[in-house]
Amino acid sequence: MGRAKKVVLAYSGGVDTSVCIPYLKHEWGVDEVITFAADLGQGDELDPIRLKALDAGASQSLVGDLIEPFVEEFALPAIRANALYEGRYPLSTALARPLIARRLVEVAREVGADAVAHGCTGKGNDQVRFDLAIAALAPDLKVLTPAREWSMSREEAIAYGERCGIPAPVSKKSPYSIDLNLLGRSIEAGPLEDPMVAPPEEVFAMTSSIDAAPSQAQDIEIRFEAGNPVAIDGVRLDSVGLIKEANRLAGRHGFGRLDIIENRVVGIKSREIYETPGLLLLIRAHQELESLTLAADVLRMKRQLEMQWAELVYQGLWFSPLKDALDGFMDRTQIYVNGLVRIRLHKGNAMVIGRSSDTNSLYISEMATYGSEDNFDHRAAEGFIYIWGLPSRLWAAARRG
């Protein structure tokens, strides 16, 4: 008896998910494998991927356009939360996983499957993200994880696939593993596993090199309403179009490359190369506008909670009660985040050079100026400093005896 009768497999067209199709059928006795591939704005032509799944033995090969919910329900909350895992990585890949898992569960219900499956390996982050999301949404569904159990190396998996008629998509000339969606690209494996090897220019596709970037700087303006980016240079765009334009502008000037050592959920460190030009640009602009419009104590608390929000998403806990509670805090703060941020793009840099808010700015020029218009009561400072420093003076006096 097989491990399941009908399985819906999260499918990308890569080595592991392609090999999963015959493996589930031949090794685990699954009667029927249905694949689901998500269109997340990666720009690939998905029809060849759909046909590849059928050639590999899938009974049905489904493709779903998830671009709009990906941006509206996942990217925009991440921008509002200034989500940067370990202060650097803007979660471009991690944000996609709970959405794919959600749709995977929906497809399983629609076709009457008794299990879902994915092709994540045993030491990656995505296995955690998929398993936890599916458990939260459909605890009754079995989750099959052949790539976690088959103990094949990447080379052995490619060879297994070739025996089953699946062509290898990776050559020795291109040994990289690449994940791509509208928010960015992640590149790993091959020579990049040596943390001292510089990434070759060939691995980048969304960003110009510093040498190829324009020599002339470009100033752009990004408008936010309730924490969401809504316009660039005065042109209002829908959320998907705005992300695309931010990618184009930032990428043209070589901004958005990351080369980092990252702490994975499973406890190991990995070397990751990311291209996330638009998302990083929008987070930087959003942070700056918050500095102008949020009260100091709210801003300090939000910066602390942002780190926890990013960690929860990275660790696969999108559907957790704590993440839901943090969303409530983030959303409440964003009603004040309205205004404009001006950024100068030049040779890999994105420097904030201006910010304004007609309705919510807490920058009062008469209080901040050192000129003749100064309305700050300097005499009040003496009493404030006395009270503020009282605990220190009492502590010092007690030490002296």
From Swiss-Prot:
Annotated keywords: Amino-acid biosynthesis, Arginine biosynthesis, ATP-binding, Cytoplasm, Ligase, Nucleotide-binding
Residues engaged in binding L-aspartate: T121, N125, D126
SUPFAM superfamilies: Adenine nucleotide alpha hydrolases-like, Argininosuccinate synthetase, C-terminal domain
Catalytic activity: L-citrulline + L-aspartate + ATP = 2-(N(omega)-L-arginino)succinate + AMP + diphosphate + H(+)
Matching InterPro entries: Arginosuc_syn_C, Arginosuc_syn_N, Arginosuc_synth, Arginosuc_synth_CS, Arginosuc_synth_type_1_subfam, AS_cat/multimer_dom_body, Rossmann-like_a/b/a_fold
Catalytic activity, EC: 6.3.4.5
Top EC category: ligase
Record-level Gene Ontology MF annotations: argininosuccinate synthase activity; ATP binding
A Gene Ontology biological process term: L-arginine biosynthetic process
Predominant location: cytoplasm
An example Gene Ontology CC term for this record: cytoplasm
A Pfam family per the record: Arginosuc_synth
Family, similarity comment: Belongs to the argininosuccinate synthase family. Type 1 subfamily.
Protein name: Argininosuccinate synthase
